Every structure is written in structure tokens, then in C-alpha cells.
Amino acid sequence: QQKDRLKEIVGNKWNGIFNGVGGDYWKNIFCWPDGLVEYNDLLGITAPTYKKYYFFSYGSKNNDFLNIKGKEKEGKWFASANNQNKFLDEREKGNWLNYLKIGILISRAVRRMHAAGLAHSDLSYKNVLVDPVTGNACVIDVDGLVVPGKYPPDVVGTPDFIAPEVVRTSHLSKDNPDRILPSIATDKHALAVLIYMYLLYRHP
């Protein structure tokens, strides 16, 4: 089933989003798998490389004492005042207007996924790269997308972003009709939490 899911993601869904009107725009805010590779019974994916501004130019304070210069700008570094003030070089922080831009870009990306009938299922600050210096954002890890009624979720989400109804029914088996799994509706909960954290630097 995972192979079929990936074929759908790199085939029909990729074409529908990136070969249509505005395809180039979406290429800037998604890192979407664009091919499958099979070797020795192993299955892999190919995907675009991240833009240069999604890697730390200066890293952390005190001559990069955390040794993160050149590493990916995972959203978690920017989603709390504590992380920013305690660890990050001032030149990496950007400004509040750029965090607003980031929130808008992530919202557009999620809306586009949902319009294609897809749910991310694990939307969190670990699966979004951000650059507060330029106001850019990119949704990553889209190889596990949920196609409602066809391909169920592989994961339930990341703590801090899991919708309450998913947590409430997590003790039930996946086959139980009362079990609530990640979906387009629960993506919206995760999106709201993510934007709140980028704009107010704390968890709601």
C-alpha cells in the first residue's frame, strides 16, 4: 500500500499541483517527491533540494556554540521565545512581519493540499522549513500524505500538534469505527497551533 501511495503522490497528485496553473509558485512552498527509485527490492523517492536560505548562515550565539551553521532551519528553532533568545544568533531571527508572511505561506500550502483531497497528517514545526530573514516557508515530508478513503495515515502526528479528538481515541484500534485518525480536519488544528507559535512564540 505504501508503494501505491507514493505512486499517487509523485504521479497524479504531483501533476495536478505542479503542472497546472501556478505550478511554479507551489514548487517554492513544497518540497514534494517527484520520482520513485527501486533497487534490490528497496523503494526510495527523489525530491528537489532545499533552497539555500533554508540552511543557517550564522547558526547559534557565541560563534555557533551549538554547531548548527549550515544545518536545516527546522521551525522548532523559531517557534518559542526561549529557543530564539537563548540559542539563536540575532541575524537568524528575522522580524515579526516575516513570521506573518510565513504563516500565510504555510496556510496556502495546506489549503492547496486539501483542495487536492490530501491531508498531511503530521503537520508540525519539524515538517516545515522556515526562513524568518526572508519570510519564506516550505512544507516538507509529504511522502506520507493521507488520501481519505484510500490511503490511511501512517502516523498520528507530533505531540503539541495532535488534535484533541485524535488523542481522545488513541487507545482504540485503527480498525475501530470510533477511532479518529489524522485527516484534513485535524490538519487544520495543527495549522492553527503552528501559526499561533510563530506569531506569539509560545504554544496555545
Question: Could you tell me what each predicted segment is?
Answer:
Residues F30-N98, I102, Y151:
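Conserved structural core of kinase catalytic domains
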